[in-house]
C-alpha cells in the first residue's frame, strides 16, 4: 500500500502539506510552503558518546602522561619521561564482528615514546612503551569488550567548589561546605550557641574553627581584624582545663595545654591530640610531640596534594566568595579558608543567599573520557607502587653486571607490567563498573536511549541510600536539557534521566548541558540567525518566552503581556524586554518521548510508561512504520546506524540478501566540468518541473531519445536537446542533503559523460511513475514527490573503461546477528537493481526499520469495548489473524557454548560415539539423529528440548568400578561405542527451547593447556546458534505508545471477532475502562486518525502540543480527516455527526450490533520483550535454600513460586485446605515430610506431612516471649494401611517470668 506523506501542522523544514480545513495553524492550500518552525538542525543523537571518546583520545591521553615517573635511592635514581605528542595507535587485531564471535576486545594497542634518564648518567635513552589495549568506540557509539557490546553512561556529579547550605529551620544551624576535586569534604558549621566548628572525615569529630585557622598559619589578630562580624568567633574558644568534658580535658592534657592554643605549634598539638582521642586505633596515652603533630597536620589534614579544587573549583571560589587566587593555583589555600569563614558569617547575618544544590549550575557531566582517564591513572599508580616495591629489594651496591644502573635493568625486566596494569584497569571499568553497562539492543530506540542516558549514581556520585526527594525531583534548570518525562520506574526514578533531543554538552570548561534559544531583538524573534547555546548559569540572566507563542509574518511577538521565565521562575512581561525564545517542543523532551503522537493529551505518568515500553518492543518479522508519527522516526534509525546508506553516488548493479553493489563514476565531474557554468545558469532560468508532482505527465518534453552519439558531434546541440532531462526543479521544498542541493537527474549526466568519452551504439531513456522512496535518513524529513526513475538498455560493466570511469562499491549486509537481548538483527535491501542513488540514500533497512523509519510495531485495527470479561483489568483479546498471518511474529536467537576441558583423567572429546544408558538408549538415539560424523548438529535442523547439539564425553577414573552394568557394556560393544569408562556430558537443548540451528561455529580454545594437549585439527570449542520463531500467544505482553499495556488473555477466531460495517473484523479488543482513569486520551486520537489514514492511504506527521494553533486543534483535525475519509470512501459510518469518532460495530458471533457505538481505529501496537516463553516455569522438585530450607526463587535456578499473604487469602476464600496444607509443608520446608513423601509415592502410599521448619521458628519465637507452647502427637489408622501420622495439638498456657529465670 502506498501512502502519501501528509503534514498536519507546522514543522521543522519546508514540507509539502495536503489541504486541511480545521482550525488556525493548519494549512488550507495544497502544495504551499510552510514557514520554518526553527532553523536549526537536530544534532546527531549519538555524537554525545563519540565526542566524549574523541576528547579522551585528543586531550585525555596527553594529560595523563604530563608528569614523569621518578624513582630514587641513596645511590641510584631513574626518571621516566613521557612524550604524549608522539602517541601511536596500532590497528585493532580483530574487526568488530570477529571480536564478538571470538569473545575478544575490539581495541587498539597504544604506544608512547618514553625517555629513560638518570642524574648520574649523561645518557638519555628513548624507547617505545606499550601502554595497553584501549577499547575503541565503534561507529555506533559503543564498545565491544569480551565479545559483548557495552555502553558507558554519562554521570552527573557535583562541581568542586564552595557551597552555602540553607539554615535548618528547626536547629537553626548554617553550614558551609567545601568540595574538593580530590580529597574529603570540609564542613564549617555554626551551632545554636553561635560556635563555629570545623569538620572533616579525617578528624572524625568537629573541632573549633579558630584552632584550625591558627594551625594553617593565620594569627589571632588577623582573624578578628580581617573578618566582618568576627565577634561571633569569640564563642569558639575552647574551654579551659577542668571546665569542659572529661574527654576534652584528656585532649588538653595530652597536648600539654591548659586553655585555648595560643600559637600555631600548640594548635598542631591540639589537633593531633584530638585525633588520637577519637581514633579507635591510636594509642591514647602517648603525648603529642611537636614534630609528630606537625607531620600529622600537613600529611593528613592540610595535604596540598589531597585538597585539589581543580580549575572548576577555583573558578567557583573566585565567583562566589571573591577569591583573589589565580586560576592556575588549584589547591586549597588558607586565604580560601578565611574567605569561606567570612561567607558563613555573612550567611548568618542574612547578607548572603544560599546556593541551590540541585541546580545544574552546581553540577557537571562526566563521560567516558574522564572515566578512561581515571582508570589510566589508576593503572599507572599500581605500576608505580609495584616498581617501588621492587626498588626496595635492590641491593645498595652496584649491580653484578658492572657499572650499569640497576634501575635500568629493573625497568627492562618489568616494563611489561605497565601495560598489564593499565589494560586490566580499563577492562575492569567496562566489565565490573556500574557505569559501563550491558547495552540494551532490543531495538534501535533502546540502543539510542541507552547511549543518551544520564545518572547520578555510581563512583563519585551518590548512592541509592543517600537520595532525597529533592535529588529525584525536576529542577527548573532541567528545562531543555534533561527530559522531565523519561526516567525509570521504581527505586531509580529521578536518579536516571535522559538528554533532551536538542541538548548538547559544552566542549570547554565545566562540562554542562546547553540548550538552544532564539535571540529576540526589540520584540522580533531572530529566526534567521543561528540559535544561542545557553548554559544553566547563563539562563539566569535571560528573559525567555515559550515556543508556543503565535508570531506575526515578520516573526514579531504580540504587543501584550506574555508568559516568560525570568530567573527560572514564571512571570509575565512585555515583548520588548524579552531576550530569548524557546525553539520548539523538542527542546523539552527526550527522543523516546518525542515519538509519542498527541503527547499533550496524556498524563505524565502514562507518557513515562510509553517512553519506557517503546524501548522494550521486539523487532517483528514484518516491520511496519506507524500511520501516525511525529517525524523523528527517521533520525533514530539514521543516527544509530541501523540502516545501510550509500557512501558514494552511483547506480545499483547487483542486489542480493547478503550484499549490494553500486557502480559509481570516478571522473564524471572532470568530464562535464566544461558545462558547469551552462548547467547552473540554465537551472536558475528554468523553473518548470519535468514531472508534475501530483500526476504523471506525458508531454513531449517528458520522453526523448539520444541516438548514436559520436565524439565529433555538436556537443552544444546535444546538451540543449537534453537539458530538461538533466535537471528538474523540486516544486515542494528545498532538500537539505549532504551531497545535493536540488533534485536533479545525475544518472543522465553520468550517461552523457560516457557518450562524451567514447561511442555507445544506442542509449535510450524513458520516464516512469515511481512511489516515494526514502532518501537520506539522517535528515529530518524527505520529499513526498514522485521521483524520476531512469532506466537504460545494455548497461553492463564491460561497456565502460576500466579504472577510468567507474568504481564498484560493495556493501555487505548483516544477516541474523544476535543482540544482547537475544533478538535478531538483519538488514534487507529495499531498492532494486539499476536504481540511481545519491550519497546518503538508504540502501537497506534494519530489523526495526521500514523505509528508513523506526518500525517497532504494527498498525492493527482496535476496538474499545468489553468482551465477555476477557479484557478485564487491561487484558487483551486478539484475533487469530495476527497469529496466522504472522503479524506479531518475531525472531529470537540464542547461542549455546561447550568447550573441551582438561580433567585429571585426560581431555574430554567431542564425538558422536556417546556412551548411553540402556534405559535411555532408544530415546537418546532418536535425540541424536541430527548429529553429524563429528558430533556436531547439522545446520538447518529443527531441534526440540532434549535434542543433542554437540556430543561430548568426559573420561572417568579407569581404576574406579565401572558405572555400567554387564549388559550395558555388551550393548555399547554391539553399537561399536567406546570401551573405556566415559561419562556423557553432551550439550543438549534446554527445556522450553525449540527452533532451527542457524549456525555452528568452531572456535579456538580459551585455555592454553587444552590447546597444547589436544591433537591437531581437533574440535575444542563449539558455539551453536539457535533461531526461534515466536508467534504471539496467550501470556505475551503488548502495549501502545501511550502507556496502555496488557497481557494477551484469549486468541479468538476472526469470525468471532467484532467487525466493522464493511465486514472488516477487528484485530484487537481493548477495555475502554483503561482510558479514563489513566488519562491517556492520546491513544483515542491516534487510533481515529489512523483509521482516516487507512482509508485515505496517507501517513501523518503530527506536531506535538498543537493547541498553540487553536483550541481543540487535535480533535478538530481528527474529525476533519474522518469526515474527509467518509466522503472519499463513500462510507458514511466512518464519521457520523451524532456520535463522531464512534462506529456501529457488529458482534461476530451473533451478527447483531452492540448496544452502543464503539470507538474503533488503527493504532500502533507493540509486542514487548516480556514473552511468556521466557516467563513460564514449572518445578517438580529442585534446590532448597541452605538457611531457610525453602525452595530458592528464580526461573534460572529452577526455583519455586512464593505464596504471599494475598495468595493464601485467595486459597482460603475457596476453602482449598488440602492445597494450602501441601504448600505449607512438603512443598516448602518440611524436611522429614518431603523425604517421606518420595518414599510413599514409590510405595504407592498416601503422602504424609510433618511440621515445617518455619513452624518451629515461630514456636521458638513465641517461647522467647514466655508463651509455653507444647506439641503432642496423635496416632490415627487408615483402613487400608497402618500408618503412624503426626497431628499437632497446641495447648497454650502463660508462664511467669520468675519461673523462667
Swiss-Prot record:
Pfam families, alphabetized: RNA_pol_Rpb2_2, RNA_pol_Rpb2_3, RNA_pol_Rpb2_6, RNA_pol_Rpb2_7
Disulfide bonds: none
Localization annotation: Plastid, Chloroplast
Catalyzed reaction equations: RNA(n) + a ribonucleoside 5'-triphosphate = RNA(n+1) + diphosphate
Record EC number: 2.7.7.6
PROSITE patterns noted in UniProt: RNA_POL_BETA
Keywords: Chloroplast, DNA-directed RNA polymerase, Nucleotidyltransferase, Plastid, Transcription, Transferase
GO molecular function terms noted in the UniProt entry: DNA binding; DNA-directed RNA polymerase activity; ribonucleoside binding
Leader sequence segment: none
InterPro entries, per the entry: DNA-dir_RNA_pol_su2, DNA-dir_RNAP_su2_dom, DNA-dir_RNAP_su2_hyb_sf, RNA_pol_bsu_bac, RNA_pol_bsu_CS, RNA_pol_Rpb2_2, RNA_pol_Rpb2_2_sf, RNA_pol_Rpb2_3
Domain of life, per lineage: Eukaryota
An annotated GO BP: DNA-templated transcription
Entry GO terms, CC: chloroplast; DNA-directed RNA polymerase complex; mitochondrion
UniProt family annotation: Belongs to the RNA polymerase beta chain family.
UniProt function note: DNA-dependent RNA polymerase catalyzes the transcription of DNA into RNA using the four ribonucleoside triphosphates as substrates.
Subunit and partners: In plastids the minimal PEP RNA polymerase catalytic core is composed of four subunits: alpha, beta, beta', and beta''. When a (nuclear-encoded) sigma factor is associated with the core the holoenzyme is formed, which can initiate transcription.
Protein name: DNA-directed RNA polymerase subunit beta
Lineage, uppermost ranks: Eukaryota, Viridiplantae, Chlorophyta, core chlorophytes, Trebouxiophyceae
